[in-house]
């Protein structure tokens, strides 16, 4: 502790208390100055002393502070490392869960589609020859529906998902908590028409059922491709293997990543034709930068993975 002194001057502080002649504290002026005006004479004043305490840090406290700071930093570093390990473990578990779901659904849907095609045409062969027109129509609608789904997805993405259905699609533009997100509901919704078309085409004969069967196959093929490219390659929800090295698919992934940056007002809204959309709005330069960034990131991840395994 240290004491300090401070002073203050007050004029006539005791004027009312000591106004009697016996305790007059006024300064006596010499007679030579009595002729001056009263305004020029000295006034009465008092000096007040206030004792002020100042707290000083002791040497012991100053010596202990660096040790406590270093220990706190060590605890913080250990806590952050623990949190990072937990986050990586959770991400690994989520990717494994989604990979199992993707593989099972893809295998199941593909197997059912192949069996449906085989049994449908073999069932029709029992009653006679297969109509070439019906077979061609089934094949044409399969390709046409797969291509048409790209344009449907582009329109729905812009006019519905980023508009009236944004409350559901917003989960796809935020950090995901867990292996699934609310946006995955759209995949289930799109599976409904495919199941209906396949069922009607399988259990009925004729050209129209054959066309419906082909359309259902096309929607199914597009859904599987969309899942592996969009969920696996772009957002890395599960490993996709060698398709990450396909140049055009790498370009597709980079284009969709620019959609999430919102640099071109959400363009591209499509997936497989996303690079074409970016070209129309002058986004080729940004697309090339994103492709280079993804290549570097992929090589870095591959290098770290191989070093850790060795």
Swiss-Prot record:
Bridged cysteine pairs (disulfide): none
The reaction(s) this protein catalyses: all-trans-beta-carotene + 4 reduced [2Fe-2S]-[ferredoxin] + 2 O2 + 4 H(+) = all-trans-zeaxanthin + 4 oxidized [2Fe-2S]-[ferredoxin] + 2 H2O
Any single Gene Ontology cellular-component annotation: chloroplast membrane
Motif Histidine box-4 boundaries: 256-260
Entry keyword ATP-binding: no
Gene name of this polypeptide: BETA-OHASE 1
Subunit structure, interactors included: Homodimer.
Motif residue range(s): Histidine box-3: 230-235
Protein's UniProt keywords contain Iron: yes
Domain notes: The histidine box domains may contain the active site and/or be involved in iron binding. The N-terminal part of the mature protein (70-129) is probably involved in the formation of a functional homodimer.
InterPro entries in UniProt: BETA-OHASE-like, Fatty_acid_hydroxylase
Pfam families in the cross-refs: FA_hydroxylase
UniProt GO BP: xanthophyll biosynthetic process
Protein name from the UniProt record: Beta-carotene 3-hydroxylase 1, chloroplastic
Keywords assigned: Carotenoid biosynthesis, Chloroplast, Hydrolase, Iron, Membrane, Metal-binding, NAD, Oxidoreductase, Plastid, Transit peptide, Transmembrane, Transmembrane helix
Tissues with expression: Expressed in leaves, flowers, stems, roots and siliques.
Residue interval(s) of motif Histidine box-2: 169-173
Origin: domain of life: Eukaryota
Lineage: Eukaryota, Viridiplantae, Streptophyta, Embryophyta, Tracheophyta
Known function: Nonheme diiron monooxygenase involved in the biosynthesis of xanthophylls. Specific for beta-ring hydroxylations of beta-carotene. Also has a low activity toward the beta- and epsilon-rings of alpha-carotene. No activity with acyclic carotenoids such as lycopene and neurosporene. Uses ferredoxin as an electron donor.
Primary localisation category: plastid
Residues covered by the Fatty acid hydroxylase domain: 145-272
